[in-house]
């Protein structure tokens, strides 16, 4: 009884400390944001035909590939260098530098890919989407501005405000997309999504300047700091980009090797629930990241809190993943209806894969990146993506979407073990 009492007191104490630091707002905001996106997409999948939903999935996948290099990763610099800045003027200079430089890069990227879209050989089932793909591409600079606005709120440790703004922008985005789907199908989804990102990206930027930097004038950072920011951002972009490729290459290869919109639609539906396991780990990662940045030189603090975060994340993800695995069929019925019930076994396999990814890999990768150890993430990610693409090219023709699930389980486990070994060598006793 004494041990149980001590453990209970310890848990209550830790919870109270997290509450004071704003963890509640981050967790609640992240959960509500993901829930709104999920709940809204449930209506979109029911409004569109299976063929239309497959086409939308194809376009969003291509857009995701391009968004990897958006802003050359400068949003990540906000999360690190605004935190490390000594005064409000320096914070403003870094934030404004990131915004201005990312806008320049995004305009160049946009023009290049608008031209490339005109000559890209889309599969025959998707050839009629060329114009609509161009409209979707125009959304990129505004979406990136919105991401930068939200990154600033995290860097300023204003967790309550971050949660509120993230929730509001997500509600607006998903419901405008749903409205567009009911009015004009996938064309409406794309156009209304563009309008939402434009309004909130610019609107939140104006609000941020008034909130934190009213009366301050921009002064460019020193040359050495600029170089450091660019290098860090580029490394983070490459690392994140490689990881994003894990998410995107599955759909891309399915589209290329199968050339069937219905297969893409079924895979997307099966992945929705496992994909939302990231709610748990991303909420924790959003909250703890800045604290690991501030204490990155305190090895004892890093080791102690890494264990807490890893165990807590693993336990929560295991619990949620277990429920998803058990109730696979009801979850499919809730989200997409009887026409997709056959993908329940695929959902179960993807849930196992998502548990390995979110429960084992993500925490270590996120903390290493926050403390500037990006190169290790990059190396592990490069090896992982080579394995994934190579194995998928063998597995997809034989097993279809199930081949993707089998591949993901093995590759994610390899990456989780590799990153854990790196962390122990850098920060372990």
Residue ranges and their predicted role:
Residues 22-41, 166-173, 189-208, 223-290, ...:
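Transmembrane helical elements of multi-pass membrane transporters/channels
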Residues 21-33, 59, 64, 68, ...:
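Membrane-water interface segments that mark the loop-to-transmembrane alpha-helix transition
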Residues 142-165, 293, 354-380:
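Membrane-interface junctions at transmembrane-helix termini in multi-pass inner-membrane proteins
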Residues 17-76, 139, 174, 234-257, ...:
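Signature of the first transmembrane helix
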Residues 130, 134, 163-212, 382-387, ...:
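Hydrophobic alpha-helical transmembrane segments
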Residues 2-19, 129, 160, 187, ...:
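Interhelical loop/hinge segments that connect adjacent transmembrane helices in multipass membrane
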Residues 71-87, 155, 212-213, 274-299, ...:
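Helix-loop junctions and terminal segments of transmembrane helices
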Residues 15, 19, 50, 118-136, ...:
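Interfacial segments at transmembrane-helix termini and the short loops linking adjacent helices
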């Amino acid at each position: 009884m004494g041990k149980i009492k001590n453990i209970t007191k310890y848990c209550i104490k830790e919870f109270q400390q997290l509450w004071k630091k704003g963890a509640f707002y981050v967790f609640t905001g992240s959960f509500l944001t993901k829930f709104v996106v999920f709940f809204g997409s449930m209506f979109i999948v029911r409004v569109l035909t299976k063929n239309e939903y497959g086409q939308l999935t194809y376009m969003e996948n291509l857009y995701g590939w391009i968004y990897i290099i958006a802003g050359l990763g400068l949003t990540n610099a906000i999360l690190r260098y605004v935190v490390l800045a000594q005064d409000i003027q320096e914070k403003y200079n870094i934030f404004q530098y990131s915004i201005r430089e990312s806008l320049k890069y995004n305009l160049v990227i946009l023009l290049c890919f608008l031209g490339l879209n005109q000559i890209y050989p889309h599969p025959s089932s998707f050839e009629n989407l060329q114009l609509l793909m161009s409209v979707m591409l125009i959304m990129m600079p505004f979406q990136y501005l919105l991401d930068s606005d939200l990154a600033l709120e995290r860097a300023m440790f204003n967790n309550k405000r971050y949660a509120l703004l993230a929730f509001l922008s997500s509600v607006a985005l998903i419901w405008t997309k749903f409205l567009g789907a009911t009015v004009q199908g996938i064309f409406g989804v794309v156009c209304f999504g563009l309008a939402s990102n434009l309004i909130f990206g610019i609107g939140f930027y104006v609000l941020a300047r008034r909130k934190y930097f009213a009366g301050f004038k921009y002064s460019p950072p020193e040359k050495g700091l600029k170089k450091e920011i660019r290098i860090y951002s580029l490394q983070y972009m490459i690392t994140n980009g490689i990881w994003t490729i894990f998410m995107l290459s599955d759909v891309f290869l399915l589209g290329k090797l199968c050339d069937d919109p219905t297969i893409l639609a079924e895979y997307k539906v099966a992945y929705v629930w496992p994909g939302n396991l990231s709610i748990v780990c991303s909420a924790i990662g959003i909250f703890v990241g800045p604290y690991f940045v501030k204490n990155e030189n305190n090895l004892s603090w890093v080791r102690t809190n890494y264990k807490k975060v890893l165990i807590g994340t693993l336990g929560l993800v295991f619990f949620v993943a277990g429920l998803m695995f058990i109730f696979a069929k009801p979850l499919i019925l809730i989200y997409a209806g009887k026409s997709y019930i056959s993908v329940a076994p695929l959902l179960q396999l993807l849930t196992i894969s998502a548990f390995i990814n979110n429960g084992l890999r993500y925490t270590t990768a996120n903390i290493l990146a926050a403390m500037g150890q990006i190169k290790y993430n990059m190396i592990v990610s490069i090896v992982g993506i080579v394995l994934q693409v190579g194995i998928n090219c063998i597995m997809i023709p034989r097993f279809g979407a199930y081949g993707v699930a089998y591949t993901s389980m093995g590759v994610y486990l390899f990456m989780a073990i590799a990153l854990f070994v790196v962390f122990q060598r850098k920060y372990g006793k």
